Amino acid sequence: MNTMPTAKTLMLLLCLLSVAAQAQDPAASETEQNESAASSQANNPLANFTAFNLHNYYIPELSGPVEETANSFILRYAKPFGKWLMRASLPFNRTPTGISMTESGLGDLDVFFAYLFDTGNPGRSFGIGPQFVFPTATEDATGTGKYQVGLAAVYFDATSAQFQWGGLLTYRTDVGGDSDRAKTSVFAAQPFYFMQMGGGYYLRGAPVWVFDLENDTYHIPVGLGIGKVFKSGNTVFNVFAEPQFTILHKGDGQPQFQLFVGFNMQFK
């Protein structure tokens, strides 16, 4: 006699739980989508957000007879305005100058402006524009002593929530400065690739391949590291560590191994 009310009660509870679960799914799904979007855009150099980054390259081994280590700590600021994005980088370098000798100081200020094209897909970003380098170095060894101009082009593809990729190409040459210093002609290519692992964690690589056309030297590293993206308020934080190994090089003083670490902030 009492089995029917019990069965009805259980059926009612199951229905209520099902309705509650369905009501919560959109919110949970939206949260997951927001977190996924933040992670996929956290490494986009053309993201439409003001950004401030702290990057460091520690180089414990250089090619040739150089025995000292090198280091480059970089302050990087990016600011969109209209259809343009400005990115400025100021390094503080420690550079070997001989056996058991190094010089430390500010490096050259590097600024480029990228015009952002409408690709027709919000997941794809492309920008191209002029690059300017100013001789702000405080020591001869930490800069070129030259004013330089060039061109920069950037592409970033975030159409996949799991895998993002792209690249940065730059070329610059000197147009003035200290006449006693060597001329400059440098081409650089930076492929980047990121695989989302869930929970804000991701695998990454963003090595810079540098070709000094004036001195006929180059180094080509590959990188594989790990990072973590998390959000606090309106700021997206991104921390990472990426070992980079040089697979091809020509000339003395080229990095053989470097550890690239960073702390990025995007302000929304």
Question: How would you describe each model-predicted region?
Answer:
Residues 1-39:
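Cleavable N-terminal export/targeting peptides
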Residues 25-268:
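Transmembrane beta-barrel domains of Gram-negative outer membranes and organellar outer membranes
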